[in-house]
């Protein structure tokens, strides 16, 4: 029964090969968590546009919100310390030095360069935590690669965020600072869940 059931395939990255879309006749819809992934699927895998729906990462809007926000002297980068984020982190080290801010890194260390960058007096490191909102709420601004969860969480807390677009090697393609959007509700957990439910209803009708 299972092999023949219609399916939805969700893709979470356009730069990690393990996230390449599965092409199978039982897959009736693809979900891309950002527009760039949709373009990647259309251009590199010839998946028709009408088969791809952009549904963003859901974020708990009760956990991440404007209340108790403040502004301390650090730029926050949340994410695994690995090859994919190395160039962005190095760029942020220089940026924060120029503007007189500290750079706080929060995430699992899965690289070989953390010890070296911590030699910079204005760089601090914290391990992964389930209470990342405590860091976001007090930050000056945040930064991350692609349009990821941390950027959305930051917007919900009223913080601007730098988005670094990188290639599969982590090299910077572009960077741009984004203010919180006016349509922030599209990232709310219940709204995202409803959109996914609607897509399943469509393919099962």
What are these regions (language model features)?
Residues 1-17, 31:
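Active-site proximal beta-strand in glycosyltransferases
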Residues 108-112, 122-137, 148-149:
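Conserved active-site histidine-acidic residue motif and adjacent donor-binding/catalytic loop
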Residues 36, 55-58, 70:
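Carbohydrate-associated surface elements
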Residues 72-116:
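Conserved catalytic-core segment of nucleotide-activated headgroup transferases in glycan assembly
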Residues 137-149, 159-160:
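Acidic donor-binding loop of glycosyltransferase active sites
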Residues 176-205:
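A charged, aromatic-enriched C-terminal amphipathic alpha-helix characteristic of glycosyltransferases
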Residues 19, 28-51:
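A short, active-site helix/loop in glycosyltransferases that binds the activated sugar's phosphate group
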């Amino acid at each position: 029964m299972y092999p023949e059931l219609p399916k939805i395939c969700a893709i979470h990255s356009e730069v990690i090969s393990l996230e390449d879309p599965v092409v199978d006749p039982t897959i009736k819809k693809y979900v891309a968590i950002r527009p760039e992934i949709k373009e990647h699927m259309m251009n590199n895998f010839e998946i028709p546009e009408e088969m791809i729906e952009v549904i963003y990462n859901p974020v708990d809007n009760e956990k991440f919100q404007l209340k108790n926000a403040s502004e301390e002297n650090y730029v926050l980068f949340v994410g695994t310390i690995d090859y994919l984020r190395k160039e962005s982190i190095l760029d942020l080290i220089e940026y924060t030095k120029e503007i007189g801010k500290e750079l706080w890194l929060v995430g699992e260390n899965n690289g070989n360069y953390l010890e070296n960058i911590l030699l910079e007096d204005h760089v601090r490191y914290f391990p992964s935590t389930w209470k990342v909102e405590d860091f976001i709420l007090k930050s000056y601004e945040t930064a991350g690669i692609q349009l990821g969860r941390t950027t959305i969480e930051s917007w919900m807390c009223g913080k601007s965020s730098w988005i670094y677009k990188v290639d599969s090697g982590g090299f910077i393609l572009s960077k741009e600072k984004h203010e919180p959007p006016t349509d922030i509700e599209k990232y709310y957990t219940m709204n995202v869940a409803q959109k996914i439910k609607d897509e399943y209803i469509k393919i099962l009708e």
